[in-house]
Amino acid sequence: MLTHLDSQGRAHMVDVTDKSVTFREAVAEARVRMLPETLKMIVDGAHPKGDVFAVARIAGIQAAKKTSDLIPLCHPLMLTGVKVELSADGADSVHIVARCKLSGQTGVEMEALTAASVAALTIYDMCKAVDRGMTIESIRLLEKLGGKSGHFKADQA
């Protein structure tokens, strides 16, 4: 059942008024593949635009907080924690992991996915002048905790 459609098939924001407040957490990931030279420049802190990981981390955090402005039927949430981690993965990619949490009436999957996506887009934006062939890959939900549907873990789905 698609919860964002009413009985006439029209889109609407789901009413969560009667749902219980529970702890909710979601973890999402993304990956940016690039030339090894581009990754080395980032890791060595030699990028002319500055600290790529720091800017991408802040962009991801800000994006999580703005998710309801970007995704029309998402509820505005009072996030209590957002963490975005970036790391070099092998010789040619950056791995991004975003974690969002709150105590609330609806989940934070979209916030975690948005954080990971925007962090990846920020890396692309900052590095496109030196590497136009970068690819953003594997944006996915890794884990979801809390709420009526319970625990989801990607490797166990």
Swiss-Prot record:
Pfam families per UniProt: MoaC
Enzyme class: lyase
CDD domains reported for this sequence: MoaC_PE
EC number: 4.6.1.17
InterPro entries, per database record: MoaC, MoaC_bact/euk, MoaC_sf, MoCo_biosynth_MoaA/MoaC, Mopterin_CF_biosynth-C_dom
MF (Gene Ontology): cyclic pyranopterin monophosphate synthase activity
Domain of life: Bacteria
Catalytic residues of the enzyme: D125
One GO BP: Mo-molybdopterin cofactor biosynthetic process
Residues that, per the record, bind substrate: L73, C74, H75, M110, E111
Key words, A-Z: Lyase, Molybdenum cofactor biosynthesis
Known pathway: Cofactor biosynthesis; molybdopterin biosynthesis
Catalytic activity: (8S)-3',8-cyclo-7,8-dihydroguanosine 5'-triphosphate = cyclic pyranopterin phosphate + diphosphate
Family, similarity comment: Belongs to the MoaC family.
Protein role: Catalyzes the conversion of (8S)-3',8-cyclo-7,8-dihydroguanosine 5'-triphosphate to cyclic pyranopterin monophosphate (cPMP).
Quaternary state and interactors: Homohexamer; trimer of dimers.
Protein name: Cyclic pyranopterin monophosphate synthase
